[in-house]
């Protein structure tokens, strides 16, 4: 009996169980733990499309009709990297949702075919062989300052946006808030034609509960409390009281100046209630110098933003200028300069690296155009993982050695921009992972470009964005190959394949009949019982201490020394600028 070498098998069908894949130009490797497509010993029985290949009439393609259950699309032979594991499988999509993860083909001539992956004449094929698939990324911290940020987000693999804004207004440039029913309605209408899911945050800075409830009825999915609007303990309590009654999440950017209390006062106002703390880091804002300590608390769902990911030799200089612009400060005013310098602390930026690696900071967002870059959430997450492997070695549970697999680290880091923000904001019943029943928001990557530029972005089952060559060429691949909108990005299709996440009170108030949107309005799940323990693979609660004079950080009693990176992967090797 003829046998295939592993190398030849990978060339024909893609890697299989036991094979390791390098992620872009990082030091990170992942190993396939299961192959649901076939694998060695079953070679020739895999679903592969092309001339002379398997998925042809009366061969790998059967006669089953769509009415009889054939999937609309099958992604063949993809390596799935998700929080729950790293496997190879075919992915079936029907009506914009994932219906099966297993083996696809024609059960009349092939063994082990999943009943929901029977390929028929109505089935389209996306070739995933030799490619990686991840869940569409969720950016949990987006300032909607201009519509172009959405194109940039899609180009990097983001399919869900949590945040707020109304355009280039001063409030939006600073605070991630869409305030009030009129602005919420207009933004939901404006975003209806983009192939991304949207969850807008209303303004939480008030002690008037009526002002909060009207925003929930008007389309907000939750609230944002920001220091630039005045973050008093009373406002925190009032906002969380309404959130508890409504079941929605509150995102908090706390008080850098400590005007209205210190971190202990903010924690007292939160009073053990679930809260998503933005900028649980060393530079983005919040109580100086010790906001990072909130990551130790069981009710706090901490995130940080990508401009400090990872700690590099350029971080300090870059942030000072960014802060001056984003928060309307004047470098010629001593008080403004002191504010900026107190907010940017190399020691806490460095500690942020470690807290991500041990799973104490659970999420990463962009803070787009407000000190962060919307197109770099995925990339900077994996740069951080690379730097931490270089510095700390293998993560607990991963084998040691230069060429050993980093599956546990990969699963932890991919969760930071997929399932963790979905759970935190009550979206995980629809998005956040590659699992049956969820929207088919999927990103395909060539391994050499993993985390840098997607091969294709599938939104609700339709290809919305892809790396595409010259449209006047004779084939799709001639240069320049650029991320470009596809048919799935047309307004009608985008509305059919994407959702607006809103509070349940919006649905009850009949919002869908009051605004000009074509997509579904989906209520967020009740998140008020969600705590740190619910953050998959990112639930650590170490003891964190910050010296108020030197800003030295101790994590479980150990000082974390600053070692800013001088060189990163996924950088100039891929980009001119």
Swiss-Prot record:
Binding residue positions for Ni(2+) 2: 224, 253, 279
Cofactor: Ni cation
GO BP terms: urea catabolic process
Catalytic activity: urea + 2 H2O + H(+) = hydrogencarbonate + 2 NH4(+)
Localization of this protein: Cytoplasm
Pathway: Nitrogen metabolism; urea degradation; CO(2) and NH(3) from urea (urease route): step 1/1
Keywords, ordered alphabetically: Cytoplasm, Hydrolase, Metal-binding, Nickel
Residues binding substrate: 226
Record: active site: 327 (proton donor)
Post-translational modification remark: Carboxylation allows a single lysine to coordinate two nickel ions.
Class of this enzyme: hydrolase
GO cellular component labels: cytoplasm
Pfam assignment, any one: Amidohydro_1
Record domain Urease: where: 136-577
N6-carboxylysine: residues carrying this PTM: 224
EC code: 3.5.1.5
Binding site for Ni(2+) 1: 141, 143, 224, 367
The keyword Signal belongs to this UniProt entry's keyword annotation: no
GO molecular function, one term: nickel cation binding
Subunit structure: Heterotrimer of UreA (gamma), UreB (beta) and UreC (alpha) subunits. Three heterotrimers associate to form the active enzyme.
Family to which this protein belongs: Belongs to the metallo-dependent hydrolases superfamily. Urease alpha subunit family.
Listed name of the protein: Urease subunit alpha
Native species: Mycobacterium ulcerans (strain Agy99)
